[in-house]
From Swiss-Prot:
Main function: Catalyzes the oxidation of L-aspartate to iminoaspartate, the first step in the de novo biosynthesis of NAD(+). Can also use L-asparagine, but not L-phenylalanine, L-glutamate, glycine, L-proline, L-alanine and D-aspartate.
Alphabetical list of Pfam families matching this protein: FAD_binding_2 (PF00890), Succ_DH_flav_C (PF02910)
One GO term (biological process): NAD biosynthetic process
SUPFAM superfamilies: FAD/NAD(P)-binding domain, Succinate dehydrogenase/fumarate reductase flavoprotein C-terminal domain, Succinate dehydrogenase/fumarate reductase flavoprotein, catalytic domain
Cytoplasm keyword on record: yes
Protein name: L-aspartate oxidase
Phylogenetic classification of the source organism: Archaea, Thermoproteota, Thermoprotei, Sulfolobales, Sulfolobaceae
Class in the EC hierarchy, top level: oxidoreductase
Keywords: Cytoplasm, FAD, Flavoprotein, Nucleotide-binding, Oxidoreductase, Pyridine nucleotide biosynthesis
Pathway: Cofactor biosynthesis; NAD(+) biosynthesis; iminoaspartate from L-aspartate (oxidase route): step 1/1
Binding site for FAD: 7-10, 29, 36-37, 42-43, 191, 337, 353-354
Marked site positions, Important in orienting the L-aspartate substrate: 102
Gene: nadB
């Protein structure tokens, strides 16, 4: 039996692909609709346009990744994108005909379904998985059992010990809800990643947390304003109507997310209010019906300037894997946001996350019967970590500490404060927060999503990955 933990785009697409390849599959998720996929707004990046190519897509990905992309992975994902999209469409999913432009891309290459692509994909895949007869069970992963470097089973809250495990596929998502301001659901707390780390997987790139620049909260309802709004003409302004982003980057609203989030955050620290102006978008209600409905719920329309702020959105790091999704533990795969394939480097290109989930999920049947290759850590430094203690922290405390000390702008004092707070706790959320702060403290430079005001420049000596391995 192949067990998949997680019910987002990676887990569901892997389940369907494996089932259609004749494999026995069971999918377990702590909350079936609780992940990031149902709330993903933008789309799937793929070089399907006549003026585009996998090479151009790879170039954009590598440029935005700021020196830390795994080039082999980038070339694999961008070259597989078209084939995977064709497979997905052959399953019955229909994208809209127009391609959209998002920040960091040099071509229109974002496939979408209105402005709520993630929800449409999730609903489609969940229905398809059920039609394929895949058991989908709500339960929570507690522990992964490993012996002699190989998975032997796992433990869940309801089922207890499960031992009939041929392969275990983790698709449990990231941990951006561990920040006080977040665009993601409350299930996104990194527990799958922490459990895998405690079982012996190697984690990498934990310092690179991506903050989305355009999140709003009208009447307390947090809502992510999709990247494609800016591709279609939305402008970001301050209370004086100034498009201040051009003071930070010549691309203005179409600069990568790390630059925009930092710029908006700095403006807010200066005392400015920041808004998104949607009035320049043609045919707004047809192109963005979900945004229009959100605004209407709160008594607004697209001609009103909407207040925005940056919020934790995605994590580039995670369980280090190769292009097959294989970790350093035999028969333990990680796909989607829980993994670190090296695709995103120090900063993810918009709409590459849904693509990554589809590529690693749909292609998984190619590799499950092959001999295990595992990973290499030759492109970085492996740091051995011990975890101990019985300190207990509430999720509210952790979210506040991370936002204040391991957030958009970092420094030594704040990072050490966070490290000291988390170092005596074995809570899953504290372990992940500890490793994020520790990686950020170790990396004494600024690169991609990681910005330190005490080391504000990129250092070529730091063009290497930071790995963590648990020492028992």
């Amino acid at each position: 039996m192949i067990y998949i933990i997680g019910s987002g785009i990676a887990g569901l697409s892997a389940g369907v692909a494996l089932r259609r390849a004749g494999k026995k599959v069971t999918l377990i998720s702590k909350r079936i609709d609780g992940g990031s996929t149902p709330i993903a707004k933008g789309g799937v990046a793929a070089s399907v346009g006549s003026d585009d190519s996998p090479e151009l897509h790879a170039q954009d990905t590598i440029r935005v990744g700021d020196g830390l992309c795994d080039v082999k992975t980038v070339n694999y994902v961008t070259s597989e994108a078209k084939n995977v999209i064709e497979t997905f469409e052959s399953w019955g999913f229909e994208f809209e005909e127009d391609l959209r432009l998002e920040g960091g891309h040099t071509k229109r290459r974002v496939l979408h379904r209105t402005d709520e692509t993630g929800r449409e994909i999730f609903n489609f895949l969940l229905k398809l998985a059920r039609e394929e007869g895949i058991p989908i069970i709500e339960d929570r992963l507690v522990e992964i059992r490993v012996k002699d470097g190989k998975v032997t089973g796992f433990v869940t809250e309801k089922r207890g010990l499960v031992e009939d495990v041929d392969k275990l596929v983790l698709a449990t998502g990231g941990y951006s809800y561990l920040y006080e301001y977040s665009s993601t659901q409350s299930t996104n707390i990194g527990d799958g990643m922490a459990i895998a780390f405690k079982a012996g997987t190697i984690l990498a790139d934990m310092e690179f947390v991506q903050f989305h620049p355009t999140v709003t909260s009208l009447d307390g309802e947090v809502f992510l304003l999709t990247e494609t709004l800016r591709g279609e003409g939305a402008q970001i302004i301050n209370e004086n109507g100034e498009r201040f982003l051009f003071n930070y980057d010549k691309r203005g609203e179409l600069a990568p997310r790390d630059i925009l989030s930092r710029a908006i955050y700095i403006e807010m620290l200066k005392g400015h209010k920041v808004f998104i102006d949607l009035s320049k978008i043609e045919d707004f209600e047809r192109k963005f019906p979900v945004v229009a409905k959100y605004l209407a719920r709160h008594g607004h329309n697209y001609k009103v300037k909407i207040p925005i702020f940056p919020a934790a959105h995605f994590v580039d790091g995670g369980i280090r894997v190769n292009i097959r999704g294989e970790s350093n533990i035999v028969n333990l795969y990680a796909i989607g946001e829980v993994s670190d394939s090296g695709l995103h480097g120090a900063n993810r290109l918009a709409s590459n996350s849904l693509l990554e989930g589809l590529v690693f999920g749909i292609n998984l049947p190619r590799y499950v019967d092959s001999s295990w290759e595992g990973i290499s850590t030759d492109d970085g430094i492996v740091h051995s970590v011990r975890i101990s203690g019985n300190k207990t922290l509430s999720l509210k405390e952790i979210r506040r500490i991370n936002w204040e000390n391991v957030g958009i702008i970092r420094n030594e004092e704040k990072l050490v404060k966070a490290i000291n707070t988390y170092s005596s706790s074995t809570q899953n959320e504290a372990i992940i927060s500890y490793l994020t702060a520790l990686a950020a403290e170790i990396r004494k430079e600024s690169r991609g999503n990681h910005f330190r005001e005490d080391y504000p420049y990129k250092d070529p000596n730091w063009e290497k990955r930071i790995y963590f391995k648990l020492v028992v």
